[in-house]
Design a protein with these regions (language model features):
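Class I SAM-dependent methyltransferase Rossmann-like catalytic core
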Residues: 1-23
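A short acidic, often aromatic-flanked loop/helix-cap motif at beta-alpha or helix-coil junctions
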Residues: 10-11, 52-54, 66-69, 146-149, ...
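S-adenosyl-L-methionine-dependent methyltransferase catalytic module, highlighting the catalytic core
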Residues: 99-210
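Conserved SAM-binding loop
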Residues: 24-124
Length: 210
């Protein structure tokens, strides 16, 4: 289940997470940490594509978008048991199938912390660019009824005035949460028929403008 989710400043929760795993003495793995290994030295296990060689760190080289490369990590967990805790920070938004990565997190750890850019961040015009959010992000996320919901980055968000309405409620550029045992997740619109583009767009903004 999802515990203690918040909108916050980017990186605001990192000291709390480091203190948490230190106090609990949790065996922790950071998934996707190569770009920014902020969980070190409290976290001594990393899985990603770019090798990290920090002292005392055990590294699993894999491609988060290719399940055939996960065998070393999964074999380790099968032999040694699940990690107490996992960290996945600013990674889910980068992969084409976040459901696979979420499944990996629950397969290798009993609990964890996830941080992702918030919807407010993804609807901003960042760094002087003429488009909203980050071009390399495949989707964005929000909490709907305490469930992590994946939203497609439809092209029409660039010009629809309701995109600006979302920003009036800005509560922070990062969405973060702790979880235990499982991560409730769904994809916006799956299993729900829409009669028209207008219906789709109206439901999209109904869930996001707040």
């Amino acid at each position: 289940m999802i515990i203690d989710w918040n909108y916050n400043r980017i990186g605001e929760k990192r000291p709390d997470v480091k203190n948490f795993i230190l106090e609990k003495k949790y065996k922790t793995i950071d998934i996707g940490a190569s770009a920014m290994y902020w969980s070190y030295p409290e976290c001594k296990y990393v899985a990603d594509s770019v090798v990290i060689s920090n002292e005392g760190t055990t590294f699993f080289k894999l491609n988060l978008e290719d399940k055939s490369t996960w065998s070393e990590l999964l074999s380790y967990v099968e032999t040694n048991g699940k990690f107490d805790f996992s960290i996945c920070s600013h990674t889910l938004e980068d992969v084409f199938n976040p459901l696979d990565l979420i499944g990996l997190l629950t397969k290798i750890s009993n609990s964890g912390f996830i941080a992702i850019p918030s919807k407010y961040d993804e609807f901003l015009f960042l760094y002087g660019q003429p488009y909203r959010g980050n071009a390399h992000h495949k989707q964005f996320f929000d909490m709907v009824n305490d469930k992590l919901t994946i939203f497609p980055k439809f092209s029409w968000i660039e010009n629809d005035e309701r995109s600006n309405e979302i920003l009036k409620y800005d509560k922070g550029r990062e969405l973060s949460f702790y979880w235990e045992n499982e991560i409730p997740v769904e994809i916006f619109g799956v299993g729900k028929p829409f009669m028209s583009d207008g219906d789709l767009m109206n439901e999209y903004y109904k869930q996001l403008v707040k």
